Curated annotation (Swiss-Prot):
Membrane spanning stretches: 68-88, 101-121, 125-145, 147-167, 185-205, 208-228, 246-266
Protein family membership: Belongs to the cytomegalovirus US12 family.
Leader sequence residues: none
Subcellular compartments: Membrane
Principal subcellular localisation of the protein: membrane
Keywords for the protein's UniProt record, in alphabetical order: Glycoprotein, Membrane, Transmembrane, Transmembrane helix
Ranges of biased composition (kind: Low complexity): 1-13
Membrane topology of the entry: Multi-pass membrane protein
Any single Gene Ontology cellular-component annotation: membrane
Protein name: Uncharacterized protein HVLF4
C-alpha cells in the first residue's frame, strides 16, 4: 500500500511539474510574441516617421527650387522684353562695332556680376533692391550688346544658349547618373565638338575661335553644373535670390559669348578705334555750338512751342 501511495505521489508531482513547465513555456511564448509585436510596431513607426520626414524635406526643397527657377524665368523674360523693344522700337538703330568695338566691353558685365555673387557668398545682400539692380544691369547691357548683331543672329544665339542651359540643368538633376558617367559624358561631348570643328573646312582663324568658344563655354557649363547641384541639395532658403541671379548671370554670359561668336563683324573689329564713335559725336556737338547751329535749332524749337501755346 505504501508503495502504491508513493507511486501516486510521484506521478502527481511529475504531472504538476509538467503543467508548470507547460505554463512557463506558454508564458515565455506569450512574452516573446508581445516583444516581437512591439518590435515590429516600433520599426513600423520609425519607418513611417522617416518617410514622413523625407516627404516634408522633399516638399521644402521642391518649393525652394521652384522659387529659384521662377525668379530665373522672370529675369530672362525681362531681358528678352528689353532686347525686343530695342529691336522693334528702333529698327534703324545700328552700331558699327567693326569701326568702334566699345559696346563689346559690355560682355564683361556678367563676369563681374558672377564674381561679385560667387566671391562674397554669405556676405552678399539678398533682397529685392539687389535683385532689381542686377536684373536691370544685365538686361540693359544685353540690349546694348545686341546693337552689334542683327535680330536673326540674336534669336539664334538665344536658342543655342537655352539649349546648352537646359541640357546642363537636365544632367545636373539626373540623380541616377554617377559622377564618373557625368564626367565621361561632358568630356566626350567636348572632344567631339572640338574634333568636328578641326575637321571642318573653315579657316584656321575660324577653327581657333570656335575651339576657344567651345572650351570657354564648357568651363561655364562645368561651373553651372556645380551651382545647380548646390541648389538641388544644400541651398538654404535665404539664398534664393542670390542663386537665381547666379543662374541668370551664367545664362547671360553664355548668350553674350555665343552672340559674339556668331557675329563675324566682331572678329575684324578695330580695337585701336575704341570709343571713336563717341568722340565723333562730341566733335559734332562742338561743331554745332561753334557754328551757332545748335542755338538756332533751340531758338526755332522754343519759338514753335510758344506759338503753339499761344
Amino acid at each position: 500500500m505504501e508503495t502504491v501511495s508513493t507511486q501516486r505521489e510521484t506521478a502527481s508531482s511529475e504531472t504538476e511539474r509538467t503543467r508548470e513547465a507547460a505554463s512557463a513555456e506558454t508564458t515565455d511564448a506569450t512574452f516573446r510574441s508581445l516583444e516581437e509585436g512591439s518590435t515590429i510596431s516600433s520599426r513600423y513607426s520609425e519607418t513611417a516617421s522617416t518617410v514622413s520626414e523625407d516627404a516634408v524635406c522633399w516638399l521644402r526643397r521642391t518649393a525652394i527650387v521652384m522659387r529659384v527657377y521662377g525668379l530665373l524665368t522672370l529675369e530672362t523674360a525681362f531681358s528678352v522684353l528689353i532686347s525686343a523693344l530695342v529691336w522693334l522700337g528702333y529698327p534703324s538703330l545700328g552700331y558699327k562695332c567693326s569701326d568702334d568695338p566699345s559696346p563689346l566691353l559690355l560682355s564683361c558685365t556678367p563676369v563681374l556680376v558672377l564674381g561679385a555673387l560667387e566671391l562674397t557668398d554669405h556676405r552678399h545682400p539678398s533682397n529685392g533692391l539687389v535683385f532689381a539692380l542686377y536684373v536691370a544691369l544685365l538686361s540693359f547691357t544685353t540690349a546694348g550688346l545686341n546693337l552689334c548683331a542683327t535680330a536673326p543672329i540674336g534669336i539664334s544665339s538665344l536658342i543655342l544658349t537655352w539649349t546648352l542651359f537646359v541640357a546642363c540643368n537636365g544632367v545636373a538633376w539626373e540623380h541616377r547618373l554617377s559622377s564618373v558617367w557625368r564626367d565621361a559624358l561632358f568630356t566626350s561631348t567636348l572632344l567631339t565638338v572640338m574634333v568636328s570643328v578641326l575637321a571642318s573646312t573653315y579657316t584656321w582663324l575660324h577653327k581657333t575661335l570656335l575651339c576657344l568658344y567651345t572650351v570657354f563655354v564648357g568651363c561655364i557649363l562645368a561651373v553651372l553644373f556645380q551651382d545647380v547641384r548646390y541648389i538641388a541639395t544644400k541651398m538654404p532658403v535665404s539664398h534664393v535670390i542670390r542663386s537665381s541671379l547666379i543662374l541668370y548671370a551664367t545664362e547671360t554670359l553664355i548668350y553674350h559669348t555665343t552672340l559674339l561668336m556668331l557675329t563675324p563683324v566682331v572678329w575684324s573689329a578695330r580695337w585701336d578705334q575704341m570709343f571713336s564713335y563717341l568722340a565723333k559725336l562730341g566733335t559734332y556737338h562742338h561743331y554745332l555750338i561753334d557754328n551757332g547751329t545748335l542755338s538756332v535749332i533751340l531758338n526755332t524749337t522754343t519759338a514753335t512751342f510758344q506759338s503753339k501755346a499761344a
